[in-house]
Amino acid sequence: MKQIEVVAAIIRKGDKIFASQRGYGDWKDWWEFPGGKMEAGETPEEALKREIREELSTEISVDKYLCTVEYDYPKFHLTMHCYICSLLTEALHLNEHEAAKWLTKNELENVRWLPADLKVIQELKCLKENANDGSRGDPC
């Protein structure tokens, strides 16, 4: 099975988390955390910053590692490294996605997430309610 390794940015602003809706491909209209494939020689942090510049025309800081998700899609195996991030600039422009939302933890289940991203939602629910540093609450 084909292997794909990607990075995903869980961008937080206050108590909200950024979600983007795919505008292309087999999973068009499904929601995901922005990010993409790592290029040869890139660290996950470098790949995240590049992908967010490409997809959203903004700059982020990569604050803390959250989790790595392994998921088997019908056509490939996905390894997704997820990081808590914050915006360094306020302006966002959707270059590849058709829509975006800032969601609270309670609103995370209101959109149709890609299957691999659902595993990230589970991790996010384990974070301390008011912690901005990504520290965990009770074990999942």
Task: Give names to the regions the model predicted.
Residues 59, 69-91, 99-101:
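Active-site-adjacent beta-strand/loop module that shapes the phosphate/pyrophosphate-binding cleft
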Residues 33-65, 104:
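The catalytic Nudix box helix
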